[in-house]
């Protein structure tokens, strides 16, 4: 299928398994599609999912032409970082913070060069424990800070899901469980997690 510029906004969700699963029935991309329908915007907005399980920012950089730029997006939502952090300790496949920033910067530049708006999302959680008690919390905060800084540097929109999830869990994780409130396994979103992402991401999209 070829894509040409037209009056319809084309939003591409670019990421890892969280975005891939976001295309499922109760995933956040599907929920955003329902909001588009409910607000009578179907003729104005088209969404495309471009999430692949296991991806790091390096992988996004390598496949951006094929999976994003070739489709002429008007807005590209970049939601990546979990595997970059998680892989450092789980499998040795993650990226150190310097390489993470370099490849993330490359992704932003490529998208902007294609005249697409950009929305950056910080990675949410690896574990739902409160008070910075999850093993990767420190790294997630450091990598999220890189994304926040890049959003300011390139003057693009930020959906700070890291802060959203941490604040939610601090308030509502009464029994301090490691998973089950917003995720199925500490990482991948359950229905409530998808709803939370949808609420904040849709507001960011509309204000973009």
Roles of regions detected by a PLM:
Residues 34-43, 58-208:
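Alpha-helical cap/lid subdomain in secreted, periplasmic
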Residues 1-53, 58-59, 63-72:
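Serine-esterase "nucleophile elbow" of acetyl-processing enzymes
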């Amino acid at each position: 299928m070829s894509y040409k510029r037209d009056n319809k906004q084309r939003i591409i969700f670019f990421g890892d398994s969280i975005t891939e699963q976001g295309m499922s029935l109760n995933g956040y991309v599907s929920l955003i599609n329902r909001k588009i329908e409910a607000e009578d915007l179907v003729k104005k907005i088209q969404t495309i999912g471009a999430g692949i399980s296991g991806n790091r920012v390096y992988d996004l950089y390598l496949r951006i032409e094929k999976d994003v730029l070739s489709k002429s997006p008007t807005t590209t939502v970049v939601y990546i970082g979990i595997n970059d952090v998680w892989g450092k300790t789980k499998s040795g496949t993650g990226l150190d913070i310097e390489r993470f920033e370099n490849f993330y910067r490359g992704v932003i530049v490529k998208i902007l060069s294609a005249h697409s708006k950009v929305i950056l999302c910080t990675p949410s959680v690896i574990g739902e424990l409160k008070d910075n008690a999850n093993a990767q919390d420190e790294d997630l905060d450091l990598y999220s800070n890189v994304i926040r800084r890049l959003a300011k540097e390139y003057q693009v929109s930020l959906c700070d899901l890291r802060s959203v999830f941490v604040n939610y869990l601090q308030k509502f994780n009464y029994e301090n469980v490691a998973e089950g409130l917003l995720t199925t396994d500490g990482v991948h979103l359950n229905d409530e997690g998808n709803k939370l992402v949808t609420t904040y991401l849709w507001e960011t999209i509309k204000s973009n």
